[in-house]
Each structure stands twice: as structure tokens, then as C-alpha cells.
């Protein structure tokens, strides 16, 4: 059982109130956060029925949002309502960008959703562009190509306060710390 800390690290993050109209987007980036406890032993949860989607990040030029769905710490969107909205996005004919598309699209299919439009997988594209890179993580690619990285200091601070592993047990945190 996870003990809720008396004092939580501050966070300025707020969930988006709505998803903007994206029908004119030429490309949409999508990233799933998952709880996948058996991935190392029995394979991805989307194939084995073990685990679930914890949250979905969506980004287009000029807007980005993270939609928490199953964080044990609360602050979640209604899954059924969000799924209907996500289906509309996935039905758009524009390019969809994923990092490790096989994994994320597998989870979306397990949810009964289909991705329409071209799928671009940065995890596959990166070694084709530069086979001699040391790392192909999304953070490493963002740093090298966009001069941007994500700060995980808030995640690690919150995980320490909650007494959990920041990566393996991220789903136990309230959404604002992810």
C-alpha cells in the first residue's frame, strides 16, 4: 500500500480543460504512459491483457496536453469520454507521431481504437538518420534535435515523497507529478 505523504512537492501543472480542434493539424504527436507489470516476463500488456493505459499525451504545433486516466493518486479524466475524443483524433488523416509506435499503437488497438493516417515512429526513424548515436531515447533525441529536454526533477521529488520508484510506479502518483 502506498502511503500518501503529508506534504507533497509543489506542482504548477494543471490538466487541459479540453482538446482543441485538431482537424487542420498536419501532424499529431501521441505518447502513452502505461502500467505494464509483466512486460519483462510475459511481454507487452496490450498483447497479454495485463496492465492498462495510465495517461495520454497529445501535442500539435502550438499546443500540448496530458490526459491522466488511471493514476492511483487521482486527478483522472473519465476514460469513456476521453476515448471518444481520442478516437476523433486518431481518425484524422494527418500523420501521427509516436516514439515506439508498435507498443503505443498496440495499446490503442487493445482499447478498440485504430490509427488512421501515416504512423511515424521516431524510435525507428532515429537510427535510420544516424546509426552511430549513443542513445535513441525520446529525451536524447529532443535534446539533440530540438535543444529541449523534459525535466524529471519534479517526478523524482514526488516519487521520493511517496516512497515509490519514479519510473516503475509512476502510476501511483497524482497526475500533476508526472
Predicted segments — roles?
Residues 44-50:
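Short consensus segments that form the blades of beta-propeller domains
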Amino acid at each position: 500500500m502506498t502511503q500518501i505523504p503529508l506534504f507533497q512537492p509543489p506542482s504548477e501543472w494543471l490538466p487541459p480543460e479540453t482538446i482543441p480542434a485538431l482537424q487542420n493539424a498536419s501532424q499529431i504527436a501521441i505518447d502513452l504512459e502505461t502500467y505494464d507489470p509483466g512486460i519483462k516476463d510475459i511481454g507487452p500488456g496490450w498483447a497479454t491483457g495485463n496492465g492498462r493505459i495510465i495517461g495520454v499525451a497529445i501535442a500539435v504545433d502550438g499546443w500540448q496536453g496530458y490526459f491522466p486516466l488511471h493514476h492511483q493518486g487521482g486527478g483522472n479524466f473519465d476514460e469513456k469520454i476521453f476515448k471518444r475524443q481520442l478516437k476523433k483524433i486518431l481518425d484524422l488523416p494527418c500523420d501521427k507521431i509516436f516514439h515506439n509506435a508498435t507498443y503505443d499503437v498496440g495499446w490503442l488497438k487493445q482499447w478498440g481504437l485504430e490509427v488512421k493516417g501515416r504512423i511515424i515512429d521516431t524510435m525507428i526513424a532515429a537510427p535510420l538518420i544516424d546509426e552511430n548515436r549513443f542513445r535513441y531515447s525520446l529525451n536524447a533525441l529532443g535534446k539533440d534535435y530540438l535543444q529541449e529536454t523534459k525535466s524529471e526533477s519534479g517526478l523524482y521529488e514526488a516519487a521520493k515523497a511517496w516512497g515509490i520508484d519514479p519510473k516503475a510506479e509512476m502510476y501511483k502518483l497524482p497526475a500533476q507529478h508526472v
